[in-house]
């Protein structure tokens, strides 16, 4: 008698083959044998990963770039693409230009002509300011549609013309009018391509500090989409010292200096030039400093200057033979990063200071700015609590500091261990006098930056093959952690993690770039003991990732190396949101683009009216709230939809901007007749703009229905039937396999068994095939009551499938999604029959 057995969760992800016999582990019961292109939700279910949207070509197709996130707030987020001595900016969002998300462009210049030649020549209305080697974006050209929404390299530039490098336009349709060209915004940087992996960054508001031991530290500052500056840091007080000091009683018996105190920041300047006085009862006059009301006065005694008073207002100080306080002296200028060999390799902010660490000459040394004065490294003798700080790790080995991370203590990660930098008490503020460095462990970190998740840190060990977490343990008063990748150690055999990014919302997934180009997903939720790994393959190699917040979720951007039309290319792509409303919004292809002609404004409606609503009948089509028609609308197809009922029409004659005559391609259901409908679309049977996939076979989804694969020719694919939403991109397959079934005691291991039926509890799913293994799959039949001509709805609930009932020793269930459709499995219930 078959016995149902439920697998209610997969919260352990893919387990290493070495653990396939460890049925005694709690994680075994929620683990998987294969998890390819599925990711694990924190609640234990699994979903096929969303596809990626093509954002644009990378700066250099021949060299690897690096993606770095820049986030001012949740509404203003960017991805910075660093290439060899260049940086380009991608605005967070979806689309091809900064207006709707994509590469940021400079101001556009109108086009006055484009030749049909090899290479094509573009003429602009006004001087374009372009130089040879620049990249430009062209769009809006009438006639020569093949040139639109594409990137081109500039060569042969004159004041108002330029050639399109390596682009033969002689076979394209002739340009007739219009169009604009805009240069990709590019910032020149000093960083060579080979040095990008070691470039460290930390951001505060609109400023990002970049550190690398081979370059002077710099601040990258944003003031607008196309307004970025990269400036070497100058480590000196921002407040100027008073000038024009003079004594009312000149002489050499006494000597005075003054400093200015900034009204806003409280920063104290360096000391002014000294002025002499004849005796101890003298006046000092000076020229005030803009932005400063207070001035400190210091008098010389036994070789040092000591504090004697403050000028609160005015420009004169009178000394009445005040004894100098030599425990309070003026700041002494210091710049520890003045020359090559002294440039820091990492930075962060902590406890009101900016911290730096790891120079070639001081690989284990930390430096901190003055409190609240981030570019001021000045000190005093004796020291003040607000002075800059210098500390060097004292350890048995010289292990370079690689990262600084601010949590409730300053964590210092070296190549050989983890240290805590603190004041000796959690309630105290770090000062030069109480700074303490205490070891927390001796694992070490790779060159991959640590990630903060909640109040824990994740880091990659120096080998690149292990991931550990680190969290404060009150019981032992220390930072403790464990290997969180040990259950999936097979994913790192012979491979290393080279980059990663944390997509916090909605599923808290750390996306890791493996050295072979495979993308790994790590669902991590420490408080619920969720540590789940998965593998994600694309038709290419992932080389860089970063994550930025976009609206209510975190978007992952990827640099992917692909082969297209026989050429190696590198593309920036964006993982699309999986929070879609229905199958029409699903995006399950890679490097994809989509045409979307569906109306989104409920005030804009379409109405068909006539005496006959059979297929082939003529009707009047009118628009309310908008005027979408023109003479060129003849031949345009439209779809009007009311729930599961829809009708397709073809425009046959133009009457006016809001009225046309049309023919019904299909019979109009009664609910669509003579009714204003807001759910309508301008339909098409082609999708253009796919030049980045020229010659590749792509998967297609049109209005929620899978179409036959098609090959991209001249940047275009065709589908059999006009649709309002067409998605095209590279296909990928999603495979899921459970572990050997265990129901003991007594154990089922080694006993023959078979599964005749399996129940998949699914959510928003379509297109799954299931079986005992990859060679014996049965596709789930899901269409039930949908109207003809409408897509099959996504299923939620239990799907019962009779599968190949062969006897075997494992009782595994294999599920595959081979179509560009979504699937989510929340539980698997096999009906198990056990033999001897």
Give the positions of each predicted feature.
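Short, surface-exposed beta-strand/strand-loop-strand elements in extracellular ectodomains
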Residues: 88-90, 419-420, 424, 767-781
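Beta-sandwich interaction modules
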Residues: 190-200, 342, 718-720, 749, ...
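Beta-strand-rich modules
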Residues: 251-264, 296, 319
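Glycine/proline-rich low-complexity spacer/linker segments in large multi-domain proteins
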Residues: 339, 732-778, 828, 835-836
């Amino acid at each position: 008698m078959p016995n149902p057995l439920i697998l209610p969760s997969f919260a352990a992800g893919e387990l290493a083959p070495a653990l396939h016999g460890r049925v005694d582990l709690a994680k075994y019961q929620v683990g998987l044998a294969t998890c390819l292109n599925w990711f694990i939700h924190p609640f234990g279910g699994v979903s096929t990963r969303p596809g990626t949207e093509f954002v644009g070509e990378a700066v250099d197709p021949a060299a690897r770039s690096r993606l770095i996130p820049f986030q001012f707030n949740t509404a203003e987020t960017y991805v910075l693409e660093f290439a060899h001595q260049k940086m380009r900016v991608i605005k967070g969002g979806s689309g091809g230009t900064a207006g709707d998300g994509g590469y940021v462009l400079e101001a556009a210049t109108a086009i006055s002509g484009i030749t049909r030649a090899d290479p094509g020549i573009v003429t602009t209305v006004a001087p374009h300011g372009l130089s040879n080697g620049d990249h430009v974006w062209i769009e809006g050209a009438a006639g020569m549609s093949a040139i639109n929404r594409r990137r081109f390299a500039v060569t042969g530039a004159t004041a108002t013309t330029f050639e399109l490098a390596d682009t033969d336009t002689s076979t394209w349709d002739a340009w007739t009018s219009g169009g604009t060209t805009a240069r990709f915004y590019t910032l020149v940087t000093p960083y060579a391509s080979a040095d990008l992996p070691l470039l460290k960054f930390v951001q505060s508001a609109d400023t990002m500090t970049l550190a690398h031991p081979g370059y002077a530290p710099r601040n990258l500052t944003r003031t607008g989409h196309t307004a970025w500056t990269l400036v070497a840091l100058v480590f000196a007080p921002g407040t100027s010292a008073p000038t024009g000091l003079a004594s009312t009683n000149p002489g050499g018996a006494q000597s005075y200096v003054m400093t200015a105190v900034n009204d806003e920041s409280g920063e104290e300047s360096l000391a002014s030039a000294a002025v002499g006085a004849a005796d101890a009862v003298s006046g000092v006059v000076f020229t005030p400093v803009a932005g400063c009301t207070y001035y400190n006065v210091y008098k010389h005694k036994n070789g040092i200057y000591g504090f004697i008073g403050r000028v609160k207002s005015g420009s004169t100080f009178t000394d009445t033979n005040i004894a100098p306080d030599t425990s309070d002296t003026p700041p002494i200028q210091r710049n520890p990063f003045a020359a090559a060999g002294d440039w820091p390799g990492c930075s962060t902010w902590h406890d009101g200071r900016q911290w730096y660490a790891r120079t070639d000459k001081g690989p284990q040394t930390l430096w901190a700015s003055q409190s609240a004065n981030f570019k001021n490294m000045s000190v005093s003798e004796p020291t003040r609590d607000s002075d800059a700080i210098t500390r060097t790790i004292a350890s048995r080995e010289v292990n370079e500091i690689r990262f600084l991370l601010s949590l409730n203590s300053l964590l210092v990660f070296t190549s050989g261990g983890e240290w805590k930098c603190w004041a000796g008490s959690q309630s105290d503020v770090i000062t030069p006098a109480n700074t303490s460095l205490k070891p927390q462990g001796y694992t070490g970190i790779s060159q991959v930056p640590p990630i903060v998740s909640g109040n824990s840190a994740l880091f990659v060990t120096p080998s690149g093959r292990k991931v550990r977490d680190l969290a404060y343990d009150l019981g032992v008063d220390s930072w403790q952690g464990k290997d969180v990748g040990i259950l999936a150690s097979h994913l790192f055999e012979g491979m290393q993690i080279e980059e990663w990014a944390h997509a916090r919302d909605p599923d808290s997934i750390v996306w890791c770039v493996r050295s072979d180009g495979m993308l790994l997903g790590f669902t991590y939720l420490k408080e619920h003991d969720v540590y789940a790994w998965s593998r994600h393959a694309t038709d290419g190699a992932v080389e860089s990732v970063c994550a930025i917040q976009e609206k209510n979720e975190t978007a992952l951007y990827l640099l992917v190396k692909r082969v297209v039309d026989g050429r190696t290319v590198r593309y920036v792509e964006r993982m699309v949101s999986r929070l879609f409303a229905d199958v029409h919004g699903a995006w399950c292809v890679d490097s994809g683009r989509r045409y979307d002609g569906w109306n989104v404004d409920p005030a804009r409606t379409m109405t068909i009216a006539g005496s006959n609503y059979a297929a082939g009948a003529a009707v009047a089509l009118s628009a309310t709230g908008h005027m979408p028609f023109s003479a060129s609308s003849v031949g345009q197809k439209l779809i009007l939809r009311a729930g599961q009922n829809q009708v397709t029409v073809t425009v046959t004659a133009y009457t006016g901007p809001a009225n046309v005559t049309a023919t019904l391609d299909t019979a109009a259901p009664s609910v669509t007749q003579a009714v204003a409908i807001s759910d309508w679309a301008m339909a098409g049977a082609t999708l253009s703009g796919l030049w980045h996939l020229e010659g590749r076979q792509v998967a297609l989804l049109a209005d929620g229905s899978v179409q036959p694969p098609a090959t991209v020719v001249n940047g275009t694919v065709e589908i059999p039937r006009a649709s309002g939403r067409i998605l095209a991109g590279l296909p990928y397959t999603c495979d899921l396999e459970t572990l050997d079934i265990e129901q003991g005691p007594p154990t089922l291991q080694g006993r023959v068994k078979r599964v005749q039926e399996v129940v998949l509890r699914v959510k928003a799913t379509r297109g799954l095939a299931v079986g005992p293994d990859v060679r014996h799959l049965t596709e789930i039949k899901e269409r039930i009551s949908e109207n003809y001509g409408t897509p099959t709805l996504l299923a939620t609930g239990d799907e019962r499938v009779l599968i190949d009932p062969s006897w075997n020793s494992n009782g595994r269930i294999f599920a595959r999604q081979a179509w560009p459709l979504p699937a989510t499995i929340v539980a698997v219930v096999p009906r198990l029959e056990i033999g001897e």
